[in-house]
């Protein structure tokens, strides 16, 4: 195999303020599940750096749940499609697909024999359905609510019971199969966000936006108590999860805390304060084996520490929004990956372990469009917030210095030796020296798009929407147009010099990469065809003999300079999402990022 996936650094859950986020547990206790965009992410609970991504939904996925057998996962999306797929093989073959109703699926529950599924959400005519997993035949009706149903659960022992919670401020109780509506529970005064049966089936709990948690008898539906008396939390409660032994309950709230309750004596055992900002609101939780997980509005997944509630054991960070750009850099003998996303967030990753964090302090406030590292070890990033930032990779702290404010929005930045950087903006080209603007071309006469600086530091190549690459010289503190045009095959989308400066690669919207030979006066060296859609990014391997291109066709090609026919094709590098950026860690390791908010490392062999 000329390529194989080496590592997957998965995205965070996609979260929305005021909406509960479901994290699915694994009956075997190894993994946990959540969704982001069109992806379902499976992660190892002991080592979250081990991840697998399922991308077969055509629409945004909302919820995914393991069957109690552990062999299948059911996932539901905003269009009302429910897919049931295999977990035992890497391919995740589809077993069944259903459309229980037209509209967003918000929660899924299985019976303990993995044979029946209940699905709820916001359909047009109905808000829920319960059916056999292998035929889709109905095994009851979910009625009794007049608004969207947020949550459903089924008692995991016979006789079966089913409970739902809805935006009509009510929970409902069903007996079955076939499941029939028994009664409505109107104890809450606000939306009911979550209902969950205890693993032994003796109790079920409901949690609501009114800050209350009520406990009921699992068999009869009679009210047992209100946790914490008058109020369980000072804010809305978005999620609850029972301990495996059914004695305790974990709750997650908009008051920025999670709590553990001892249900039998109705008391709080631990309170986990998660922070003071809006992003610290708790929207989801999972209690699996000894692990207590909660999800913050920031998308971060917190591993809670019962022995020290004030500080999580571990926080999984990363991106929850699409990644736009990436760069790599060796620091203290280790290779790090730096990725910048659509929301202005920059993350750094240890390329070996996947350990990652974001920079300290206040950084970009809008999409990070391009990043590169200069010779003094500073990360230079340009963003839609109209700034270029210089950030020390030793400190990894956004300092008040190191921000260059531009007149117009920058699109791309490239660095050369001697403290030079060239920024391409909308209708403007700016030369920076030692973090200061020293020259600009205000009306270049074409729309510049991308820029590369020759490793020698004297020549700048700028690609335009008009399909040409123009060459400029850096003379002291000015840029001089050399008057030389290199023709691409379409609007230029990226340009890159090889590390030895011998070649310039240019990719375009017409699906072609053209390589020019620098020593021969930029004569055309070779043309590379293969992509099925616009190419958006390029990166040269350190060996200067190979380069990679990524496109809107979800493909990555690794090309051989001397022979366009010798190529490695990575199909569906990021399935259903186009490749946004590429970089090489070494001659055989390629890193790709995409709008699926994940980072992947590939081993390439020639």
From Swiss-Prot:
Location(s), subcellular: Cytoplasm; Cytoplasm, Cytoskeleton; Cell projection, Podosome; Cell junction
Entry keyword set: Acetylation, Actin-binding, Cell junction, Cell projection, Cytoplasm, Cytoskeleton, Disease variant, Phosphoprotein, Repeat, WD repeat
Listed GO MF terms: actin filament binding
Residue(s) carrying Phosphotyrosine: 238
Residues the record lists as N6-acetyllysine modifications: 28, 81, 95, 115, 480
CDD domains reported in the protein's UniProt record: WD40
Gene Ontology BP term (one): sensory perception of sound
Expressing tissues: Expressed in peripheral blood mononuclear cells (at protein level).
Cellular component GO terms held in the UniProt record: cell junction; cell projection; cell-cell junction; cortical actin cytoskeleton; cytosol; extracellular exosome; extracellular region; glutamatergic synapse
Phenotype upon changing residue 501 to S: In PFITS; uncertain significance; almost complete loss of protein expression in peripheral blood mononuclear cells
Keyword Transcription among UniProt keywords: no
Superkingdom of this protein's organism: Eukaryota
Pfam families named among the record's database cross-references: WD40 (PF00400)
InterPro entries: G-protein_beta_WD-40_rep, N2O_reductase_N, WD40/YVTN_repeat-like_dom_sf, WD40_repeat_CS, WD40_repeat_dom_sf, WD40_rpt
Pathology linked to this chain's protein: Periodic fever, immunodeficiency, and thrombocytopenia syndrome: An immunologic disorder with variable manifestations including early-onset recurrent respiratory infections, stomatitis, cutaneous infections, and neutropenia.
Family in the record: Belongs to the WD repeat AIP1 family.
Record's function text: Induces disassembly of actin filaments in conjunction with ADF/cofilin family proteins. Enhances cofilin-mediated actin severing. Involved in cytokinesis. Involved in chemotactic cell migration by restricting lamellipodial membrane protrusions. Involved in myocardium sarcomere organization. Required for cardiomyocyte growth and maintenance. Involved in megakaryocyte maturation and platelet shedding.
This protein's name: WD repeat-containing protein 1
Taxon lineage: Eukaryota, Metazoa, Chordata, Craniata, Vertebrata
Protein encoded by which gene: WDR1
């Amino acid at each position: 195999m000329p390529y194989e996936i080496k590592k997957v650094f998965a995205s965070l859950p996609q979260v929305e303020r005021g909406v509960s986020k479901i994290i699915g547990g694994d009956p075997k206790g190894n993994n946990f599940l959540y969704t982001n965009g069109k992806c379902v992410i499976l992660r190892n609970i002991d080592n979250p750096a081990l991840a697998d991504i399922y991308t077969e939904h055509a629409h945004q996925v909302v919820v995914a749940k393991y069957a109690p057998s552990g062999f299948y996962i059911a996932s539901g999306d905003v269009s009302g499609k429910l897919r049931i797929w295999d977990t035992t093989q890497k391919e995740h073959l589809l077993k069944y697909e259903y459309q229980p109703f037209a509209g967003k699926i918000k929660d899924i529950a299985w019976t303990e024999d993995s044979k029946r599924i209940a699905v709820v959400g916001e359909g047009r005519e109905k808000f829920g359905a319960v059916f056999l997993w292998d035929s889709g035949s109905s095994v009851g009706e979910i009625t009794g609510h007049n608004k969207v149903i947020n949550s459903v659960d089924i008692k995991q022992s016979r006789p079966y019971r089913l409970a739902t919670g809805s935006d009509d401020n009510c929970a409902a109780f069903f007996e079955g199969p076939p499941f029939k509506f028994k009664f409505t529970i109107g104890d809450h005064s606000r939306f009911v966000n979550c209902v969950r049966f205890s693993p032994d089936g003796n109790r079920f709990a409901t949690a609501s936006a009114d800050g209350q948690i009520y406990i009921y008898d699992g068999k009869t539906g009679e009210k047992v108590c209100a946790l914490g008396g008058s109020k369980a939390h000072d804010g809305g409660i978005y999620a609850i999860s029972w301990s495996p032994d059914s004695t305790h309950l974990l709750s997650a709230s908009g008051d920025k805390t999670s709590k553990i309750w001892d249900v039998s004596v109705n008391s709080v055992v631990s309170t986990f304060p998660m922070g003071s900002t809006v992003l610290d609101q708790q929207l989801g939780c999972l209690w699996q084996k000894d692990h207590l997980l909660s999800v913050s509005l920031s998308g971060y997944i917190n591993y809670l520490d019962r022995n020290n509630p004030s500080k999580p054991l571990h926080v999984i960070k990363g991106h929850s929004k699409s990644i736009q750009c990436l760069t790599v850099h060796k620091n203290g003998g280790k290779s790090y990956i730096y990725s910048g996303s659509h929301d202005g967030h920059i993350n750094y990753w240890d390329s070996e372990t996947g350990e990652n964090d974001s920079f300290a302090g206040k950084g970009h406030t809008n999409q990070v469009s391009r990043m590169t590292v200069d010779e003094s070890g500073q990360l230079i990033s340009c963003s839609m917030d109209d700034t270029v930032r210089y950030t020390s990779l030793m400190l990894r702290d956004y300092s008040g210095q190191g921000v260059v404010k531009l007149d117009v929005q920058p699109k791309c930045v490239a660095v050369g030796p001697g403290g030079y950087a060239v920024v391409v903006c909308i209708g403007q080209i700016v030369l920076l020296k030692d973090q200061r603007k020293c020259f600009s071309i205000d009306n270049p006469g074409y729309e510049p798009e991308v820029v590369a600086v020759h490793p020698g530091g004297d020549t700048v190549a700028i690609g335009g929407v008009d399909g040409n690459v123009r060459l400029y010289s850096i003379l002291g503190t000015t840029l001089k147009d050399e008057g030389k045009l290199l023709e691409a095959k379409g609007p230029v989308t990226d340009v890159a010099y090889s590390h030895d400066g011998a070649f310039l690669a240019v990719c375009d919207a017409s699906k072609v990469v053209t390589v020019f030979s620098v020593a021969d006066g930029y004569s055309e060296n070779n043309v590379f065809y293969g992509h099925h859609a616009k190419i958006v990014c390029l990166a040269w391997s350190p060996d200067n003999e190979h380069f990679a291109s990524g496109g809107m066709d979800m493909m990555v090609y690794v090309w051989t300079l001397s022979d366009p026919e010798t190529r490695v094709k990575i199909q569906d590098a990021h399935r259903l999402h186009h490749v946004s950026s590429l970089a090489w860690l070494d001659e055989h390791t390629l890193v790709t990022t995409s709008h699926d908010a994940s980072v992947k490392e590939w081993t390439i062999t020639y």
